Amino acid sequence: MSSPEEMPHVRKLFEEYAASLDIDLCFQDFERELETLPGGYGPPDGIIIVAFSDGEAAGCVALRRLESKVCEMKRLYVKPEHRGKGIGRALAGAVIERAREIGYASMKLDTLRSMTEANALYVSLGFTECAAYCHNPCECPVYMELSLI
């Protein structure tokens, strides 16, 4: 769980995540999200988790409320030099567990078809494709959902 002292790490990881994409996140009001961290990812309805490896912020994931019993996983990102160590799976597992503790019944996420490694991770965690639940103007978005009960 992120502390106020970790917000600079979170901001940097979020910026690296955005830069790694072939899209502009302006449709998600990404700049405002950065300016207001933790924003909707703050307690009691959300969380940001940062993973450290050898003292360095290696990755992150965030959770926010969509509806009464529905949450959304956002910003799952692991720095390239830390990939292949299970950090992404550990982050996803931790945020899923926290969502259950908060009392959410389901978790959603949106991703891109081109993010094949991330999509394989989500499927291995039990996510299945679902109907669109948010605006995503990108080519080939994928919407997924996981039952938490």
Predicted regions and their residues:
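Acetyl-CoA-dependent GNAT
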Residues: 1-74, 79-80, 92-94, 98, ...
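Conserved G/P- and acidic residue-centered "switch" motifs that form tight phosphate/ATP-binding loops
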Residues: 55, 86-88, 103
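Active-site acidic-Proline motif in GNAT/NAT acetyltransferases
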Residues: 79-85, 113-114
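Alpha-helical macromolecular-interaction surfaces
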Residues: 86, 90, 94, 116-117
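C-terminal "cap" of GNAT-fold acetyltransferases
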Residues: 105-108, 112-149
